[in-house]
Design a protein with these regions (language model features):
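N-terminal nucleophile
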Residues: 1-426
Length: 426
C-alpha cells in the first residue's frame, strides 16, 4: 500500500486435512461493508469454532448496514463485539468443548514427543534398555520441560480464563493425562494440570487460528491502514486472539508490502532471503561452533578461556546475522518500497497479484510439503479513500447472466464509493 490506496490479493486454494485434497475455490477476500472503504483477507483456518468464516463475515456485513466508524481499529473492535453478541446465532457455545479439547490435546502432544525422543536418545547412548529409575528421571524431565515451555509463553493481555477452565475442564484434563501418561506421579500430575489450564491465558495457538487482515480507512483516516489479527476461539464468552501487527501509511512511511500466510517466497523476493533461512543460520552456526570447540583439546586454551571463546564467537555470529538483515533491507527491500510509494493504483494492484502468482508458481513446481497449497483464481481489490472498495478481479461460482437477482439485491444501497450496478460488484 501507499498513500493513494491499498491493494489486496488472495488465491483460492484450500487444503483439506493433511494434503488429503486441495480445492481451488475458496473465497479469502471480502468487502467488510457495502458502503465504507474497508476489506478483509482471511487465511490459515477457514472455520472459526465450527462455523465457516465466510458466513460470519457476510452476516457482519449485512448487520452493519450503513454504519461507519472513524478509524479502522473501530471496525475491528465492532467485529469482535458482533461475534460475542451473536454466540447463540453461530452456536459457539456448542463448540466450546471441542475447541478446549483441541487446545490442551495439542499442548500434551508435545509432552509425548519429548518423552519418546528422550527415551530413544538415551537408549542409543547407553546401547541397552533403560532401567525403571532411568525411565522415571526421563519422565519427570519431560514433564518439567512442558512446564517450562508453558511458563515461557507470553500471556494474552486482559484475559483470565484459568479459573473457568479449572472449574469446568480440570477433571477431564486430569483423566486425559493419566490415560495417556500412566507413569506420571501425583506431584507431576497436579503441576501439569495446573499448567494446562493456564495455557488458555497464553499465546498458544498451535492447534490453529483464523488469520484476519482488516484493511482500509475509517472516516478520519486519510491514509490506508492494516490491522492483522490471529483469532483462536471463544471460551466462556471471552475471545482468545492477539494483534500480530498494525501497519499504517503516514507522512514519513510512504509505502509498505505485507505478506500474509505463506510468506517465504514473497520474503525472498523482497529481501533476497526469507525468515526461515535467517533463523536456521542463527541456530546452526552457534551449534557448529559449540561442537567444534568441544573437539579442541583444552590445552590449546588458557585456563577458563574456552567458554569465553565460544561466547565471543556466538556474539560475532549474532552480529553477522543482524548485518545480513540490514543489508537485505538496504539493498533489496528499500528500492522496492521506494518504487511502491509512487505506483499508480492500477500498478499497485498488479504488484499485489504478482506476489500471489510467484508464490503459486513455486508451490506448483516445487516438490515439497507445500505443493499446490497456493493456486487457483486470484481475487484482487483496491481500496482508496475516494473510490472505496473496488473489485478488479473476482471469481463467482455461478454465471452472472443467469443470476441477475444476486447483483440487484447487492446494489440496493447507493453510495459515492460505488458506481453503477454493472461496473462494481460488491
Amino acid at each position: 500500500m501507499n498513500k493513494n490506496a491499498i491493494a489486496l490479493a488472495a488465491d483460492s486454494a484450500v487444503t483439506i486435512g493433511k494434503h488429503l485434497a486441495i480445492h481451488n475455490s475458496a473465497n479469502k477476500l471480502f468487502a467488510l461493508s457495502k458502503i465504507e472503504p474497508v476489506g478483509v483477507i482471511i487465511y490459515s483456518n477457514a472455520d472459526f469454532m465450527g462455523i465457516p468464516v465466510e458466513i460470519i463475515l457476510k452476516q457482519y456485513k449485512s448487520a452493519m448496514g450503513d454504519k461507519a466508524f472513524n478509524t479502522l481499529e473501530e471496525y475491528v473492535s465492532d467485529f469482535f463485539a458482533f461475534l460475542l453478541q451473536h454466540t447463540e446465532l453461530f452456536h459457539f457455545h456448542n463448540n466450546e468443548k471441542p475447541y478446549v479439547q483441541s487446545v490442551y490435546i495439542d499442548l500434551l502432544k508435545g509432552l509425548t514427543g519429548d518423552y519418546q525422543h528422550s527415551i530413544k536418545k538415551k537408549e542409543s547412548e547407553m546401547q541397552r534398555n533403560l532401567t525403571p529409575d532411568e525411565l522415571a528421571i526421563i519422565q519427570h524431565d519431560a514433564v518439567c520441560a512442558t512446564l517450562k515451555f508453558v511458563d515461557n509463553i507470553p500471556p494474552l493481555p486482559g484475559l483470565d480464563l484459568t479459573h473457568y477452565i479449572e472449574a469446568t475442564y480440570s477433571h477431564e484434563i486430569c483423566e486425559h493425562i493419566t490415560h495417556n501418561f500412566p507413569w506420571i506421579t501425583a506431584e507431576d500430575l497436579a503441576a501439569l494440570v495446573k499448567a494446562t489450564c493456564s495455557i488458555f491465558n497464553r499465546l498458544f495457538f498451535r492447534n490453529g487460528y483464523v488469520g484476519l487482515a482488516f484493511a482500509g480507512y475509517g472516516k478520519n483516516d486519510i491514509f490506508p491502514k492494516m490491522v492483522h489479527i490471529h483469532l483462536s476461539g471463544i471460551v466462556n464468552g471471552k475471545m482468545r486472539y492477539y494483534q500480530k501487527e498494525r501497519v499504517s501509511i503516514t507522512e514519513s512511511q510512504n509505502a509498505t508490502i505485507t505478506p500474509l500466510a505463506q510468506t517465504d517466497v514473497m520474503q525472498t523476493f523482497l529481501f533476497g532471503i526469507n525468515d526461515s533461512f535467517i533463523q536456521e543460520i542463527g541456530r546452526e552456526i552457534p551449534l557448529q561452533i559449540a561442537n567444534s570447540i568441544q573437539k579442541v583439546d583444552d590445552t590449546f586454551f588458557a585456563e577458563g578461556k574456552k567458554q569465553n571463546v565460544q561466547q565471543e564467537l556466538n556474539t560475532i555470529t549474532t552480529g553477522t546475522v543482524q548485518s545480513i538483515i540490514q543489508k537485505a533491507q538496504r539493498q533489496y527491500l528499500r528500492p522496492i518500497t521506494q518504487s511502491v510509494a509512487t505506483l499508480p493504483i492500477e500498478e499497485l494492484a498488479l504488484l499485489a497479484e504478482s506476489m500471489i502468482n510467484i508464490t503459486s508458481i513455486r508451490r506448483r513446481v516445487a516438490i515439497d510439503d507445500n505443493i499446490g497449497t497456493v493456486g487457483g483464481p486470484i481475487d484482487v481489490a483496491i481500496i482508496s479513500k475516494c473510490d472505496g472498495f473496488i473489485w478488479l478481479k473476482r471469481k463467482h461460482y455461478f454465471d452472472r447472466a443467469y443470476n441477475p437477482q444476486y447483483f440487484y439485491s447487492h446494489y440496493m444501497i447507493k453510495s459515492p464509493n460505488y458506481g453503477d450496478l454493472d461496473n462494481n460488484p460488491v
